[in-house]
Amino acid sequence: MPFLFYNQIIFYFCTMNFLIVGLGDIGKEYEDTRHNIGFMVADQLVKESNASWSLLKHAYYAEFKQRGHNVYVIKPTTYMNLSGKAMNYWMQQLKVSIENTMVVVDDLAIPFGSLRIKPKGSAAGHNGLRSIEATCGGQNYPRLRFGIGDNYPKGRQVDFVLGPFDKDEQKDLPALIDHSIKMIQSFVNIGIELTMTNLNTK
């Protein structure tokens, strides 16, 4: 407990840099697909923060202040399979540590409606995460896993992730995106451990 309290003091009184990486694919044909939920969360985060996007090297880029911290948000334009190229470039440019970088990603392994932050983990077959692992030095980076479930016939995984959310899911999306933003804001404000305890959903 003293250690957590000390960490909270650091978060409140030291200016820190954070990078939020929403994963997805560029192009109208990919808009509103399950695989692009990282882009959707990033878009809403930037909108609510009264920031705006600029098209820069390897990514759409936005920035804003939150409780004195610098928060940078990117949507890689490298396509999913080269997401690590954009993330590594902007980590270096902005001098953001891997511990302060949050990747927002769709996750087949957890049910739709489940939102879980974790400090590290495997790529679990996700090409965007594989690229990040290969380019950014391993598996020890925070990620926000947005559950999309695995309700698809055998052999149709690609069609499923590149397809739109169904009508019932679309009704729930605004609330889930809103909760995702609260998780990101909490990550910036009080750190990953307390955010996991307070805001992860099953």
Which positions does each model-derived feature cover?
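Nucleotide and nucleotide-moiety/phosphate-recognizing core
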Residues: 2-120, 130-144, 151-156, 171-202
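Short glycine-enriched, charge-decorated loop/helix-capping segments at active-site entrances
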Residues: 116-122, 161-164
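Hydrophobic alpha-helical segments within soluble ligand-binding/sensing domains
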Residues: 125-128
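A hydrophobic, small-residue-rich beta->alpha segment in the mid-to-C-terminal subdomain
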Residues: 167-168
